Amino acid sequence: MFRGASAVNLDSKGRIAIPTRYRPEILEINQGQMVCTVDIRQSCLLLYPLNQWEIIEQKLSKLSNFNPEERSLQRVMLGYATECELDSAGRILISAPLRQHAKLEKSIMLVGQLNKFEIWSESEWQAQIEKDMTLGASGQFAMSEALSMLSL
């Protein structure tokens, strides 16, 4: 399970270091294999351990190629999906198209989301968090049925 936000740096070759606390799980369960793709709604990337990505792939494969929205989701998520592997220093390489999509520069935020990470440029992350906090504080947060049942 991945949780918390970590500030990491993108090196000149397009690599980021996965925080040490997550490496054993990724190595033990997935032999260091991960998949990175785009988030279709926000300018961040989604980084999955291989076993979690395979669950997403199964769900995507069940969508209809004849439904334009479903086909679009398949095209983008699968089209950008890039396999990556932790190297001996615990780094992964993020491809140039993925870096461009998420506007990644040197300062990156790696944000745990239980079964995956979100990868944000630091400036985009700060803007998104500010937006999320403002929305929550304003009381204009649209409650889905699942959210209305959630007790924290």
Curated annotation (Swiss-Prot):
SpoVT-AbrB domain: residues covered: 5-52, 81-124
GO molecular function, one term: transcription cis-regulatory region binding
Family according to the record: Belongs to the MraZ family.
Location in or out of the cell: Cytoplasm, Nucleoid
Summary of subunit composition and partner proteins: Forms oligomers.
HAMAP family assigned: MraZ
Keywords: Cytoplasm, DNA-binding, Repeat, Transcription, Transcription regulation
Keyword DNA-binding assigned: yes
Domain of life assignment: Bacteria
Coiled-coil residues: none
Signal sequence range: none
PROSITE patterns: SPOVT_ABRB
InterPro entries: MraZ, MraZ_C, MraZ_dom, MraZ_N, MraZ_sf, SpoVT-AbrB_dom, SpoVT-AbrB_sf
One Gene Ontology cellular component annotation held by this UniProt entry: nucleoid
Protein name: Transcriptional regulator MraZ
Keyword Transcription: yes
